[in-house]
Structures are given as C-alpha cells and as structure tokens.
Amino acid sequence: MSGTLSFDFPSYAVVGQKVESYVSGITTPSGSDLEYFWVSSDMDISDNDTVIGQSISFTLPADPGEYSITVYARSISGEYYSSSSTASVQVISTDADGVTGRYTDVRDGEIYHYRTYGSLDWFTQNLRYSGADADTLLGRPYDDSEGIDQIFGRLYSWSDATGGVSGSGLGGGPQGACPEGWSVPTVEDWEDLALAVGGSALDFLDHWAGIGEMVSAPITLNGSAMWPYSPDNLHTNTRDWNGFPTGNSRDHYGEYENIAVYGMWWASTENADGMVPYRFIFYNTDTFDVYYTDKESYGVSVRCVRLSSQGQ
C-alpha cells in the first residue's frame, strides 16, 4: 500500500463532546478495496471493541484526561501489509467562574458570564462566536480543535474581532464579533479596568505590575495547573476576571503557539501607525503588559464589554 493514513481528530476537547472523523490517504497498487478498523484502549467508541468503516462517530469520556484512538487499514484481498495511524486528545473540564450576571447571545444561544468592573460590564469568559455561517467564519479554536472553544474561546485576528473598525472612548468600541449591545474594548475601557482592579489610574502603555496576577485564574488541565508555576505570578484571580493561558495563532490562523504560557486579549484602538494592541499575561511575571502588532497575522482572545448602565 502507498500513502499515509490521515484523519481529523481534535488535540483538545471538552468532556462529553461528540467527535466525528473520516480516514483517507491510502491506496493499493492494484486498486483493490480497503477496509478500516478503529480501536481505542481507553475510550468506549462503540458497543464492540472495534469500529469497522472509513468513518467514526462517538462521544468522548465524561472524565478529563488524555485519550487515544488508532485506525488500521488493510486490503481486503490480503495481498498487502496493513497501515495504521494513532491520534491523542486532551479532554478538559473546568469550573472557573466569576459572575455578576449571565448574558445569552441570541445569534447562537451561547451563554456568557459577566462581571461589573468600574463603569463597564466585562465578559469573564473569552468570546467563542464563530460567525453566522461557513461563509462568514470568524476566528478559530486553538489548534483548530472544535469544542475546546467552550472553555478557551476562539482566537481572532484583529480584523475578525473588530470588523476592521477602530474604537475610542469609554464604551466606544466596535461591536465586531461581539453580541449586539457589546463591543471590543478600547484603550479607555482597558484603563477603566485597571483602575477598578488595581485601585489607581494606569496609562494603557504601562506594564500594569501586579494586575496580571489578580486577573489570571489558576485553571487546572486534567488535574495539573495549566499556568506553569512561578513565584512571580501565583495567578490568584482575586478579581474574578478568569484570565486563561489560551495562547495565540500566527500567519492568519496558520500556526498555533503559547498555550499554557500566555493569555492575550485585543484592544480595538488602532494607533497612528496602523498597528493594533493586545494586552498579555505571561506565566512568569505579574504584569498585564501591552504589545502592538498588525491587524491580520496574530490571533488572540476577545473579551466583550458594555457600559454597565446598559444592562440595567
């Protein structure tokens, strides 16, 4: 047989998520038919130990952990050796929270928790809206692992996040990918958060020492801390903002990196040079720093905000 077996399988998923996969990539010189077998030693993929067929659909376990599945291909005639391929998935669950209220996004039925800081209501979860349909796809889940966005949210380019519109002023950001009545935070919105969390006014371009520790959450991934340990940032989450180290994408969703190392979130205010900012938390420092990049290459997380009076 020639070729390599390949099948789509998520790197990360949530407990109880339904997974569907289709295998391809192998041919025989004689063109003889192939048969496929799916096997897992640690997941219940069917009533039997083995699933026969080119596709598979099953539900991931209810317990967090790392699980694997192997698919085998062989020629029905028996004239060629078999080929196999194995993939693993990290199944995740978390109950990290921080709630003033709940908001239902009418576009897709997703429910978000929010909390009031200063003059604004802030989502305490990352946005996970994927667009109205396949033709208007917005953002991507980390490593293209659909389902993980239920915990981590999606990563968006600045243009996807904001609709390409810069914002300014308190509560003056563009709706972008956020629900109606909510917006992508401006520089002034972020400064208002810093004042509410830290108790003193901070310029947007400052490093925001100490704030990163107060807004990053000690999330666990299958029983282990997701943020690597550092005495310089204990991720106390004392302000219940629930910052997770969800990483970023590069090359317009072409590569993914920095999960469990960085958490990053957009601001909607473009500078005079056409560059756009995101704030970030690094596991090894207690700051909530800022960096500027272009509008398309990087993908980071989004928090949505609204003036708190709008929710009354």
Model-found features: residue ranges?
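Proline-enriched interdomain boundary motifs that mark the N-terminal boundary
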Residues: M1-F9
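A short beta-strand segment in extracellular, disulfide-stabilized domains
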Residues: G16-T27
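Solvent-exposed loop segments of extracellular immunoglobulin-like
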Residues: T27-F37
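Surface-exposed, flexible coil segments in extracellular/virion-facing regions
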Residues: V39-F58
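Short, solvent-exposed loop/turn segments at the edges of extracellular beta-sandwich modules
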Residues: R74-Y80
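C-terminal edge beta-strand
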Residues: S83-S93
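Conserved positions within compact, well-structured domain cores
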Residues: T94-Q312
